[in-house]
Amino acid sequence: MSVKRIWKWMILAGVVLLALAALIPVAVVLGSKAFTAQEQAARTDWSFSTGDVVAQSSQWQVDLTEADLGDGLKALQLVPQDIEDEDFTYYDEDVQERLYQTVQELKNNSDLEWTASMPLAILNPYGTGSNGLYLYFETDMATSVSYTVHVDGLTDFTAEAADASGKEYTKTHEFQLIGLVPGEVNEVTLTISGKWGNTRQTIHFTVDMPETRSGYSTQLKVTEGESTAAQADGLFTMMRVNGYLGYGFFFDNDGVMRYEMVLEGFGLDRVLFCGDEILTCVSSSKLARINGLGQVTWVCDLGEYDLHHDIGWGADGEVLALAEERGNDTVEDRLLSIDLETGEVTELINFSTFLQEYYDITRPVAPTDDFFWQVGEWD
């Protein structure tokens, strides 16, 4: 090869390298923006597969459909008739009220008698837990309910039913059965016990639970640690999982998914307990309270702010939230106060001005910084 041709190849290689050097920062910026933008994305498709429509509530604009749970338990699924509208969300108090009233009409239907052997069963009635099963029935005497979920190859899951009344013993039973494994045939045993501990009734049924909405694995790898302390009997809650934003996952001690929470977006960065309800972030700009039936009882829209990322209790019972003003270059620089009674959102501190001297010596994140996925942002 001649010297002249070698020089041509060297020049061409140099041009390519320069072009790549110029494109890499652009690619980093575009990739980082896409990465952070997913946190602000809100769900636009709430639709799901279900069976035939068996009835309709014209007053509450809700379709009653057959839940596709196999040949065992017969259950319903509630489908708001506006579910495909562009601005629809389950995290809307009006939508929740319509679903609640539909459930009340079913409970109070004088033509039907709901018993333990033939309960009112509704899969995910409030749209917040894809594998949560609502049960309602009455007993002749005040009793308590416990249940066991058996799936071949997995450890049995046993829990006490948390009745919506808050009572341990009652004649009217209304609760959400948690623990059904998605994508599996679940054999459920309900044990109905009297106040003296005697078993008054045992009910068996199967639930062929559909796959997860998210596609996330229902079985995690479990590694035995060195601690000798006993594990709690509750469920582990996973925070935001990239690639699966818009969901919250609850796993038992054996790494089996027992509940898949369906959110508007974002993820469960923090779950607070508010009486018998949980309070959590259901999108980057919304907080919600959810009761034990999966019903959303309160929603707070943060308006021009996005969470980033923690929430906690204030001294006077308000919620404090770390946030940022949408569209600003500065991020994670606002402290908000949210009044749980009024839903009023107040900005308490703008750290960019509160710590002005420190802010003046900082700069936006560069493509070569450790937090390169936030390139261009003033963190």
Question: Which functions belong to the PLM regions below?
Answer:
Residues 74-104, 111-114, 119-147, 173-174, ...:
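Histidine-/acidic-rich catalytic cores in large beta-rich domains
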Residues 2-20:
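N-terminal Sec-pathway targeting helices
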Residues 2-3, 42-57:
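Composition-driven, intrinsically disordered low-complexity tracts enriched in small residues
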Residues 50-89:
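Long lumenal/extracellular ectodomains of secretory and single-pass membrane proteins
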Residues 36-39, 68-72, 115-117:
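Long, solvent-exposed N-terminal ectodomains/accessory regions
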Residues 21-45:
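Membrane-interface motif at the C-terminal end of an N-terminal transmembrane signal
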Residues 154-168:
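Solvent-exposed serine/threonine-rich low-complexity stretches and specific carbohydrate-binding patches
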Residues 152-154, 195:
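Short coil/turn motifs at secondary-structure junctions
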